[in-house]
A protein has these predicted regions:
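DNA major-groove recognition helix of helix-turn-helix
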Residues: 65
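DNA major-groove recognition helix of helix-turn-helix/homeodomain DNA-binding modules
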Residues: 74-91
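Short, charged recognition helix plus adjacent turn
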Residues: 89-99
Length: 99
């Protein structure tokens, strides 16, 4: 059996077949969640300490570290990052049109 390789679009969610708008939303949320999880690890925080820092409950931090992406909005994730002193910036670019 031959395996076919495809070039990635750069968005794993798009590659998995999600509609473009949903794929982009999922990509952004996943990046924000990854950054929050990195921050927890870098600072050596317990889930309780992270919850206090982020202004959420410990079960919400558990959902975060378990990757429950559907439970978080971009707004919530940005607010959690802002409470850590982080500055969240976005860059909007026109996508190349595919013929």
């Amino acid at each position: 059996m031959k395996t076919k390789l495809r070039r990635s679009s750069g968005n794993v969610f798009r590659d998995l077949g999600f509609p473009p708008r949903e794929a982009e939303n999922l990509r952004i949320r996943s990046e924000l969640m990854i950054r929050l999880c990195q921050l927890i690890r870098q600072r050596g925080l317990t889930q309780v300490a992270a919850a206090r820092l982020f202004g959420v409950s410990q079960p919400r931090v558990s959902d975060l570290v378990r990757g429950k992406i559907g439970l978080f909005s971009i707004d919530m994730l940005v607010n959690m990052l802002a409470r850590t002193g982080a500055q969240v910036t976005f860059s909007v670019k026109a996508r190349a049109r595919v013929a």
